[in-house]
């Protein structure tokens, strides 16, 4: 923690993340740094990841072109039950105390799954929804290339995680985890749609932990991401994460916390913004059939498993059901 960040006149501490360099030939050193980061906070930077600056710029440029389309055009691509497509702003109340609606919009894509695939229609499985090529030429190709290359970065990080957990380096390369059966998906976010009042603090995403394995976040260098390292503490202490040009911000999700028996902590985070902001997250997620259970290197007689064994698909469904129940409960309390 080095200094403070000002968000609409409010100062909060800045938390300086540890950094993993994927070009570092000493992978065991990287594993040691990653292990410390995941045990202390559950979030870190990744640099020299192999994605070119040209691709990153092209991706963000195409994303901005989509969100700049007329609302009527965007709503033609409304998201479906597989969580593919466009999510307009004001879909939910994200702050029950103030009744603030969602001032962000999003677009969701994932690994393409054919309509006749048995998994099609489940969360994060299904054919993608694409804008017409005559409206956004090259959009689909850019998005798929970015997603594919980012998934490969995630696999490289997964190998370092494996070493940090005393597993074989290719443990997470299994088809059902991060291999060719992965249920990974990408979300593109635009915070601060027309009509947003930037004179006050705006919650773009309420406090939450990601449900997946790990998340790779890239931003347009506008501040907004905040973390709470002690997620069960009251009151919560929020710290700002500085955006770093060309770097991914990687955070631990609930599934990795469960696999590691709580050694690696999923991080509670939120987005608070004071100006227009674009970001994208690649959410690495095992297949629905993968069984989440404590890894053999993370348990012992003195440290038995802390979490119940559960299939990925069942866990995802339980999280969405809980989210829906909490929303109903909070709305009744207002």
From Swiss-Prot:
Its cofactor is Fe(2+). Its EC number is 1.14.11.-. GO terms for biological process: biosynthetic process. Fe cation binds at residues 208, 210, 269. It catalyses: (1R,2R,3S,8R,10R,11R,15S,16S)-3-(acetyloxy)-15-(1-hydroxy-4-oxobutan-2-yl)-2,7,7,11,16-pentamethyl-5-oxo-6-oxatetracyclo[9.7.0.0(2,8).0(12,16)]octadec-12-en-10-yl acetate + 2-oxoglutarate + O2 = kihadalactone A + succinate + CO2 + 2 H2O. The keyword Oxidoreductase applies. SUPFAM superfamilies: Clavaminate synthase-like. 2-oxoglutarate binds at residue 277. Binds 1 Fe(2+) ion per subunit. Expressed in maturing fruits and in juice vesicles. Keywords: Dioxygenase, Iron, Metal-binding, Oxidoreductase. One of its GO terms (molecular function) is metal ion binding. It is an enzyme of class 1 (oxidoreductase). Residues 181-286 form the Fe2OG dioxygenase domain. The keyword Metal-binding applies. It holds the Pfam family 2OG-FeII_Oxy. Pathway: Secondary metabolite biosynthesis; terpenoid biosynthesis. Belongs to the iron/ascorbate-dependent oxidoreductase family. 2-oxoglutarate-Fe(II) type oxidoreductase involved in the biosynthesis of limonoids triterpene natural products such as limonin, a compound with insecticidal activity responsible for the bitter taste in citrus. Catalyzes the formation of kihadalactone A. This is Kihadalactone A synthase LFS. It comes from Citrus sinensis. The lineage of its organism: Eukaryota, Viridiplantae, Streptophyta, Embryophyta, Tracheophyta. The gene is LFS.
């Amino acid at each position: 923690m080095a200094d403070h960040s000002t968000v609409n006149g409010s100062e909060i501490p800045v938390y300086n993340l540890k950094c993993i360099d994927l070009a570092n030939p000493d992978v065991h050193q990287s594993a040691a740094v990653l292990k410390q980061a995941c045990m202390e906070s559950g979030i870190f930077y990744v640099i020299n990841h192999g994605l070119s600056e040209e691709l990153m710029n092209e991706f963000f440029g195409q994303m901005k072109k989509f969100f700049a389309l007329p609302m009527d055009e965007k709503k033609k691509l409304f998201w479906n039950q597989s969580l593919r497509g466009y999510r307009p702003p004001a879909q939910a109340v994200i702050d029950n105390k103030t009744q603030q609606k969602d001032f962000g919009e999003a677009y969701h894509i994932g690994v393409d799954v054919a309509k006749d695939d048995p998994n099609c229609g489940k969360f994060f499985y299904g054919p993608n929804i694409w804008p017409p090529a005559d409206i956004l030429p090259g959009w689909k190709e850019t998005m798929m290339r970015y997603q594919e290359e980012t998934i490969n970065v995630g696999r490289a990080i997964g190998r370092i995680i494996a070493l940090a957990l005393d597993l074989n380096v290719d443990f997470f390369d299994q088809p059902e985890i991060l291999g060719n059966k992965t249920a990974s998906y990408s979300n593109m976010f635009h915070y601060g749609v027309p009509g947003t009042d930037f004179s006050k603090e705006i919650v773009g995403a309420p406090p939450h932990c990601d449900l997946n394995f790990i998340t790779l976040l890239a931003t347009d260098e506008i501040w907004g991401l905040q973390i709470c390292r002690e997620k069960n503490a009251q009151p919560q202490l929020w710290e700002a994460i500085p955006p770093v040009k060309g770097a991914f911000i990687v955070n631990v999700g609930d599934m990795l916390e469960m696999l590691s028996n709580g050694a690696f902590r999923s991080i509670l985070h939120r987005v608070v913004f004071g100006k227009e902001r674009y970001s994208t997250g690649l959410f690495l997620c095992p297949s629905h059939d993968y069984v989440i259970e404590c890894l053999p290197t993370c348990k012992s007689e003195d440290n038995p498993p802390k979490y119940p064994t559960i299939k990925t698909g069942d866990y995802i469904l339980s999280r969405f059901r809980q989210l829906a129940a909490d929303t109903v409960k909070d709305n009744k309390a207002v």
